[in-house]
């Protein structure tokens, strides 16, 4: 099978029904950060504690503006002697420009890596299938492993899967020999929605503080004990003064159309429908089920009913996320 990305589009499947699948992640991009001041610089820019990030771990963190609103969220990890992060391609250029604003005063180089290829491997027996290509695979305890030109990231949610930062030669070999079905970024997006990992595309950049997208519920995503970083005051206020009234939800059901990032939905109140929320991402699955990731008021009743705007005869309901939103005070 010839290697050519993006792989042809198939309707995504849920993690419970997904066969072994190799996924081209063309909707995501990679940025590298190198130089002696890299750790210190990133520590002053993102919500995670970069100084505590082990070489065998990755973390979903946020890069905020001065008001605590996220330019984007970043999947940060060590790559060789440097740091790297993955984010949605639609926000990458603007986010990187913002991150570079004060870099002139530090010994750090920030650049998009156009040569690296991003692939996902997920579905049934994905660990077993990958083990014939790499001598060591990451797991929950050692979530980042490097082998030659490839860095492998492990994810436990919604079920075991792997993200590979690699080169063309390895991608060609995997495409040819993995004996997996192929799919494009929509499949990985569906798995991220199921996992409760917030998706920030361009339409929602600088719209939400991290807690509105549940980032504080993901291990290491927001550190409230580290030193100053851009937007810290607003992020801390949301926690300690209860200023955040929003949360991120996963909705599932039927819809005749797929909403776009930035769209609102409708919430059923008696026999009326009221506009609510902001869509982060949405996908239609192979069984016609529609999944939507949306930010709404964080006091929504679990039995609430929603729909895409003006989508009569269809409805969506709240699904349980695989993590707790209860915070330590």
UniProtKB/Swiss-Prot annotation:
The keyword tRNA processing applies. Pfam families: YgfZ_barrel (PF21130). GO terms for biological process: iron-sulfur cluster assembly; RNA modification; tRNA processing. Its main location: cytoplasm. SUPFAM superfamilies: Aminomethyltransferase beta-barrel domain, Folate-binding domain. It is found in: Cytoplasm. Folate binds at residues 28, 188. Transmembrane segments: none annotated. Keywords: Cytoplasm, Folate-binding, tRNA processing. GO terms for molecular function: folic acid binding. One of its GO terms (cellular component) is cytoplasm. Folate-binding protein involved in regulating the level of ATP-DnaA and in the modification of some tRNAs. It is probably a key factor in regulatory networks that act via tRNA modification, such as initiation of chromosomal replication. HAMAP family: tRNA_modifying_YgfZ (MF_01175). Belongs to the tRNA-modifying YgfZ family. This is tRNA-modifying protein YgfZ. The lineage of its organism: Bacteria, Pseudomonadati, Pseudomonadota, Gammaproteobacteria, Enterobacterales.
């Amino acid at each position: 099978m010839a290697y050519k990305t993006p792989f042809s589009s198939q309707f995504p499947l849920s993690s419970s029904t997904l066969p072994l699948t190799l996924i081209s992640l063309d909707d995501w991009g990679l940025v590298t950060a190198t130089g002696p001041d890299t750790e210190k610089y990133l520590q002053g820019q993102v919500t995670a504690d970069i100084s505590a990030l082990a070489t065998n771990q990755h973390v979903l963190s946020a890069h905020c503006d001065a008001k605590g609103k996220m330019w984007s969220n970043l999947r940060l990890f060590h790559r060789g002697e440097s740091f790297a992060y993955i984010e949605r391609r639609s926000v990458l250029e603007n986010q990187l420009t913002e991150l570079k604003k004060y870099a002139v005063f530090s010994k750090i180089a920030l650049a998009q890596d156009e040569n690296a290829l991003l692939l996902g491997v997920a579905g049934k027996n994905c660990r077993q299938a990958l083990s014939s290509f790499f001598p060591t695979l990451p797991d929950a305890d050692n979530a980042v492993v490097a082998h030659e030109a490839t860095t492998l990231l492990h994810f436990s949610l919604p079920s075991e899967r792997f993200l590979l930062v690699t080169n063309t030669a390895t991608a060609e070999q995997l495409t040819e020999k993995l004996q997996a079905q192929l799919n494009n970024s929509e499949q990985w997006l569906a798995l991220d929605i199921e996992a409760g990992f917030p998706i920030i595309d361009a339409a929602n950049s600088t719209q939400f503080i991290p807690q509105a997208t549940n980032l504080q519920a993901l291990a290491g995503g927001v550190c409230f004990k580290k030193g100053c970083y851009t937007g810290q005051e607003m992020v801390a206020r949301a926690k300690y003064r209860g200023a955040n009234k929003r949360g991120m939800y996963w909705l599932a059901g039927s819809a005749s159309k797929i909403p776009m990032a930035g769209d609102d939905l409708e919430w059923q109140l008696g026999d009326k429908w009221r506009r609510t929320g902001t869509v982060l991402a949405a996908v239609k699955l192979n069984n016609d089920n529609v999944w939507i990731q949306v930010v709404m008021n964080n006091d929504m009743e679990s039995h609430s009913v929603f729909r895409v705007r003006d989508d009569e005869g269809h409805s969506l309901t709240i699904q349980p996320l695989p993590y707790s939103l209860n915070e330590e005070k």
